[in-house]
Amino acid sequence: MPADTPARYLAFADGSSLSNPGGPGGTGFVVVDRARPALRFGATRWVTDGTYAVTNNRMELRAVLEALDGLPEGEAVDVVSDSRYVVDALSKWIHGWRKKGWRTAAGEPVLNRDLIEALDARGRELRVRYSWVRGHDGHPVNEVVDALAQSAARGATGPSEANVIEALRAAAVIG
């Protein structure tokens, strides 16, 4: 897909860990189908099961996984995140990590490998492009997914569908 061609789906995702590491954490996402238009959004609260600590980076990765869940195979998706870690891990670093047997440049095991591999596998089923947006800088949709993630982490009710639609309109994602 050419770099200047918008994908059919546009996904915004954000994660939050109230105590990093340790949690609890939350994820939030908004997905827009530009062909219909149609909208899907959600938030999930996460606590540790003892296997992995709840961290900001794990929540950011989980938010993207949740956003990509259920999208039709072969479709193009533009994923927008305020996490440079997510964008760089999935669009740059992953190639070197695979070649080095999932080791970093310093020879250490790649953190969050389970989620990165899951996103890589899902990314192979879809055509995913990742882009970064500055967090807490007034982007309406990023602010909404941030609020979804933080509300989920606190176990509180997050933004409503009307709030999500208002943010999408403010960002000129929908009319």
UniProtKB/Swiss-Prot annotation:
Its cofactor is Mg(2+). The keyword Metal-binding applies. One of its GO terms (cellular component) is cytoplasm. Residues 5-154 form the RNase H type-1 domain. One of its GO terms (molecular function) is RNA-DNA hybrid ribonuclease activity. PANTHER family: RIBONUCLEASE H1. Belongs to the RNase H family. This is Ribonuclease H. It comes from Anaeromyxobacter sp. (strain Fw109-5). The gene is rnhA.
